[in-house]
Design a protein with these regions (language model features):
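Conserved glycine-rich cofactor-binding loop
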Residues: 15-16
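Conserved glycine-rich Rossmann-like NAD(P)H-binding loop of the short-chain dehydrogenase/reductase
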Residues: 29-45
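The beta1-alpha1 cofactor-binding region of Rossmann-like NAD(H)/NADP(H)-dependent oxidoreductases
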Residues: 59-69, 101
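Substrate-binding pocket helix/loop in short-chain dehydrogenase/reductase
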Residues: 95-96, 103-105
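Active-site helix of classical SDR
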Residues: 119, 155
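Residue(s) in the substrate-gating loop at a strand-loop-helix junction
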Residues: 139
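SDR active-site lid
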Residues: 172-241
Length: 287
């Protein structure tokens, strides 16, 4: 799907960081953008600069009941929906024993259930046109988990698994799915981290992580403007990858994860295969 034609985007969490950079890049490219944010007042400058092509919508990405209304507003204003970006996100820092059930569920609402509802609302329009791109802003933490960020990684792992199934289901309708897996980028993400209550058991073991996460704000390697430009170009291109590690750290770290994972499978393959019935016939599956 190579196209220079005007596309219409929905971008959640577009008030800052990746979302803001994406909105600015898409608008600068001549596209229409619906910026879905909790505080529309903060988007007045963008709405004024792009009054014909930018629609600001009040939206909480965790509110699954609001998804259909956001898509309807987009179609009413621009007549089509080409690109959906589930970008809204945040993180909770703390050991498994320190993070509460409420904190874990809130991240699942934000990173899985909210995006799932918005995708379901958007798909009829995309399927109807047999065209569309769904961009899921994941993380390198959606492929490799780190101590102290279990809740965040769990929610991103869930998003990735759900999205991989989605990609196979919607491909026959001309709809693509792109999972973006950034490393650290110079956004306000780290400034907005939520830290769980610190227990004596993990105070020392996770102290370096907490300090690193808190101290990284403003010195991250990744440039969100460059990243946004890449995503906009991909949305207009013929081919997109299912997964795009974004940033040098993500490329290096995830390459190592895949190499070590394959080596581990091969190391234990003989034992693993011995669990089958001796006379079992290998299954033939549709996928």
């Amino acid at each position: 799907m190579t196209t220079d034609a005007t596309q219409t985007w929905i971008i959640t969490g577009a008030s800052k960081g990746f979302g803001r950079a994406l909105a600015e890049a898409a608008l600068a490219a001549g596209d229409n953008v619906v910026v879905a944010v909790r505080n529309p007042d903060g988007m007045a400058d963008l709405a004024a600069e792009y009054s014909d092509t930018c629609l600001v919508a009040r939206f909480d990405a965790r509110d699954t009941h609001a998804a259909a209304g956001l898509v309807s507003a987009t179609l009413d204003r621009f007549g089509r929906l080409d690109v959906l970006v589930n970008n809204a996100g945040r993180a909770v820092i703390g050991a498994v024993e320190e993070v509460s059930d409420a904190q874990l569920r809130d991240l699942m609402d934000l990173h899985l259930f909210g995006p799932a509802a918005l995708v379901r609302a958007a798909l009829p329009a995309m399927r109807g046109r047999r065209s569309g791109t769904i961009v899921q802003m994941s993380s390198q933490g959606g492929r490799v988990a780190f101590p102290g960020v279990s809740a965040y990684c769990a929610s991103k792992f869930a998003l990735e698994g759900w999205s991989e199934s989605l990609a196979a289901e919607v491909a026959p309708f001309g709809v693509r799915v792109l999972l973006v897996e950034p490393s650290r980028f110079r956004t306000a993400f780290n400034a907005g981290l939520e830290f769980s209550a610190v227990s004596d058991s993990y105070r020392d073991t996770l102290a370096p992580l907490r300090a690193d996460m808190a101290g990284a704000d403003g010195v991250q390697e990744g440039d969100p403007v460059r990243a946004a430009g890449i995503i906009v170009r991909l949305a207009h291109s013929e081919h997109v990858p299912l997964r795009l590690p974004l940033g040098s750290e993500a490329v290096e770290r995830l390459s190592g994860v895949y190499r070590r994972g394959l080596a581990e499978v091969e190391r234990w393959a003989e034992i693993a295969r011995s669990a089958d019935f001796d006379d079992a016939v290998s299954a033939v599956r549709p996928v």
